[in-house]
Amino acid sequence: MTKPSVHEHPGVLADNGLCEPKTPAGRRLLDLLERYLPALEAESRDNDREATLPVHLFDRMRKEGVLGATVPEDLGGLGVHSLHDVALALARIAGRDAGVALALHMQFSRGLTLDFEWRHGAPSTRPLAEDLLRQMGAGEAVICGAVKDVRGTTVLTRATDGSYRLNGRKTLVSMAGIATHYVVSTRLEEAGAPVRLAAPVVARTTPGLTVLDNWDGMGMRSSGSVDIVFDGCPVDRDRVLPRGEPGVRDDAALAGQTVSSIAMLGIYVGIAEAARRIALTELRRRGGAPAGVRTTVAEIDARLFALHTAVASALTTADRLADDLSGDLAARGRAMMTPFQYAKLLVNRHSVGVVDDCLMLVGGAGYSNSHPLARLYRDVRAGGFMHPYNFTDGVDYLSEVALGR
């Protein structure tokens, strides 16, 4: 088999995928991340086997400015605002350790959403957003979201004296073990007032907060996706971000959900690219390639081209509309979420298919847990569970777009 030019594969995708950053800030982030890739790759097998978040690498990232990547420059960060560039950065990390990329997404996502709160949020929430962003930019705050409930609903209640208390349990909170703050999705229940949704920001040192050491997932084992228990945690009123009404669809809110989650698509593109790289390296080592192998390789590359193109297109739309508050905000939300869900549906299906085919090409050696393809095989399947919609919810959303409610 003839070895291709080093420019061949990236060149085909240069105008259609996650290949190059679109902003100088995105380039600075990629340059920073390059220094971590060798260690990530070298440690990925042990981190997977032991289900361990590489705390020492995150500590380096905190000190060297990576964890402040999506914080505005005015507040001490790198100023990466492009969703395309964030997705590209996550793809590069995921090619070495997807669990670390998933954990890193937690911090990047919070920077993006808090930046929006700071610039466009209600006057009462802007000081909180600015304070958190400054701490992130200084390397003092590591913030992750806590969304998925365990056995019931996490509830924020307000007592007659005006104080708040948080009770409940969240699961699959990636990076929770090293976080300093948690943005918690809750129901807000107040006497004499309708139930609302809220997102209290809870510090790690808050009384009643317990971070469990219970992560033993099938894949993404280096993400540190543990449970958190809230047992009467006190929350100051000025640390609560208001959200919408439970059970009421608010299409304007789809924009924020898109900004928070769309960059994760880069993780699964990065996994598929890594699987291709491993498979082609093995095929070249063996020499020769039967027709069936060549057909499979061609199909892998065609699917990767489709993934790159779909994801880059959805990210371009999201970047274009993210700060456009000039028109119908519900229409803006739908215009951001719909291409995101088209791309997510394609990524969830075809990234899995690419990894499966790469495992088939490598053969039985890849079925051993010690082989990197085995880890990618497990990691790539996490995409179907990622926010904001799983497969069935995404299908419901897209079918409503096509057929109406």
Swiss-Prot record:
Keyword Oxidoreductase carried by entry: yes
Enzyme Commission code: 1.14.13.-
Disulfide bridge map: none
Keywords assigned by UniProt, alphabetized: Antibiotic biosynthesis, FAD, Flavoprotein, Monooxygenase, Oxidoreductase
InterPro entries, per the entry: Acyl-CoA_Oxase/DH_mid-dom (IPR006091), Acyl-CoA_Oxase/DH_mid-dom_sf (IPR046373), AcylCo_DH-like_C (IPR036250), AcylCo_DH/oxidase_C (IPR009075), AcylCoA_DH/ox_N (IPR013786), AcylCoA_DH/ox_N_sf (IPR037069), AcylCoA_DH/oxidase_NM_dom_sf (IPR009100)
Family of this protein: Belongs to the acyl-CoA dehydrogenase family.
Protein name: Amino sugar nitrososynthase DnmZ
Any GO BP: antibiotic biosynthetic process
GO terms for MF: acyl-CoA dehydrogenase activity; flavin adenine dinucleotide binding; monooxygenase activity
Pfam families per the UniProt record, alphabetical: Acyl-CoA_dh_1 (PF00441), Acyl-CoA_dh_M (PF02770), Acyl-CoA_dh_N (PF02771)
Coiled coil: none
Pathway participation: Antibiotic biosynthesis
Subunit structure: Homotetramer.
Superkingdom of origin organism: Bacteria
Entry cofactors: FAD
Keyword Oxidoreductase appears in the UniProt entry: yes
Positions contributing to dTDP binding: E117, R332
PANTHER family from the UniProt entry: ACYL-COA DEHYDROGENASE, ACYL-COA DEHYDROGENASE YDBM-RELATED
Main function: Nitrososynthase involved in the biosynthesis of baumycin. Catalyzes the double-oxidation of TDP-L-epi-vancosamine to TDP-L-epi-vancosonitrose. The rapid turnover of TDP-L-epi-vancosamine suggests that this compound, or a closely related analog, is the natural substrate for DnmZ. Can also catalyze the double-oxidation of TDP-L-evernosamine to TDP-L-evernitrosose.
